[in-house]
């Protein structure tokens, strides 16, 4: 019973760290819980993806898929406080404006948004909206999307998995990056979560991080082609971090999450158009 209670606490600690969703008061907080709670990051993504899907489903009947997705994206930004988007913006400023490791880390730490950050986050959000919009446009769908001759339940399930995968799988790969690289700073906001991450935590994160992706591939095998976009992007992000700062920071993890999520959104264009 104590173990179950601890795991519940770890989930809420992770959710409180990554989002603005309030947790029950009885959860409490201990700093060492942050490290153990990181395995629940994909689970939080699973929840966020489900909530985003619900908002999208609600508004698409009123405004169509493009506006509905934009609203759902705004809803998610409110829930998370643009936590990962802020990291992506700082990452763009650091990598774009710094030539030395110390300069890059200093720029990333600066809370002000620079030209690279503003341009990067604008393009990122635009790619998300246009990617999903183009996917729906290919089939000229105004109601339930992804009509492949299957039942309405499969349509709903496919879209739900699409949204959940974008949020959970991207957070799983963000955790994986923590295992592949060391923490780049002596101190930082993400350091309590980053220390001593182990493979059992990675395996646990697979439950909610990888399962939705595999389920979507099972329903629509062509979605496996999305890895042609995801893997090179992940490797490129890894190479940038290893080359320029010899590790990762919290901003880097946010950038990885956002890049992979965007890859998943735009993958719908060349995956479902092939079916």
From Swiss-Prot:
Membrane topology type: Multi-pass membrane protein
GO terms under cellular component: plasma membrane
Subcellular location: Cell inner membrane
Predominant place of localization: membrane
GO biological process, one term: cobalamin biosynthetic process
Cofactor names: Mg(2+)
Transmembrane intervals: 53-73, 113-133, 144-164, 204-224, 225-245, 253-273
Main enzyme class: transferase
GO molecular function: adenosylcobinamide-GDP ribazoletransferase activity; cobalamin 5'-phosphate synthase activity
Pathway where it operates: Cofactor biosynthesis; adenosylcobalamin biosynthesis; adenosylcobalamin from cob(II)yrinate a,c-diamide: step 7/7
Ranges in a coiled coil: none
Chloroplast listed as a keyword: no
EC code(s) of this entry: 2.7.8.26
InterPro entries tied to this protein: CobS
Annotated function: Joins adenosylcobinamide-GDP and alpha-ribazole to generate adenosylcobalamin (Ado-cobalamin). Also synthesizes adenosylcobalamin 5'-phosphate from adenosylcobinamide-GDP and alpha-ribazole 5'-phosphate.
Protein family membership: Belongs to the CobS family.
Protein name per the record: Adenosylcobinamide-GDP ribazoletransferase
Source organism of the structure: Leptospira biflexa serovar Patoc (strain Patoc 1 / ATCC 23582 / Paris)
Lineage: Bacteria, Pseudomonadati, Spirochaetota, Spirochaetia, Leptospirales
Gene: cobS
